[in-house]
A protein has these predicted regions:
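Short helix-capping/hinge SLiMs at alpha-helix to coil transitions
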Residues: 12, 27-31, 46-47
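Hydrophobic alpha-helix position signal
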Residues: 7, 43-46, 63
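Short alpha-helical segments that sit at the start of domains
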Residues: 1-22
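Basic amphipathic alpha-helical segments that dock to polyanions
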Residues: 56-66
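DNA-recognition alpha helix
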Residues: 35-48
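Non-DNA-binding regulatory cores of transcription-related proteins
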Residues: 66-133
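Amphipathic alpha-helical interaction segments
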Residues: 20-23, 38, 55-58
Length: 133
């Protein structure tokens, strides 16, 4: 019922495919990071109806627009998504392609430049790229 309400609040019809995608994303205790490709593999395991990668991308984009997930762009411009929608930052390890959450309070910025005229800052997220020592 909660999943169906989440879909409807995103202006998405609760089809079997969308319900399955939403369950993979939101029916868990822990938040997590994913790509459209890793989500595609997870929902297309044996025993489930096949869901196209296009449907995955469209549904993920709709959830992002609705504020149910966040998009994180890494330095290689790869899109990752996060079910944790609270303000926080990330470590990114390009070797493992893993993101790790950093509490928002852990990163202290001394000065943020003023935005261009007619614009305001909507959000600020820091992605710290890692490498081996």
């Amino acid at each position: 019922k909660e999943i169906i309400n989440k879909l409807r609040s995103s202006n998405l019809r609760p089809t079997k495919q969308r319900i399955l995608i939403a369950k993979k994303l939101f029916d868990r205790k822990e938040t997590f990071h994913f790509t459209a490709e890793t989500l595609n593999k997870a929902v297309n395991k044996k025993g489930h109806a096949r869901i196209s990668l296009g449907t995955i991308y469209n549904t993920v984009e709709a959830f992002k627009r609705a504020g149910h997930i966040r998009e994180i762009l890494t330095n290689n411009s790869k899109s990752y998504y996060d079910t944790n929608i609270k303000s926080h930052h990330h470590f990114y390890d390009p070797g493992t392609k893993k993101l790790t959450d950093i509490d928002y309070q852990e990163v202290i910025l001394k000065k943020i430049p003023n935005p261009p005229k007619g614009k305001k800052i909507k959000d600020l997220e820091v992605v710290i790229s890692l490498q081996k020592k």
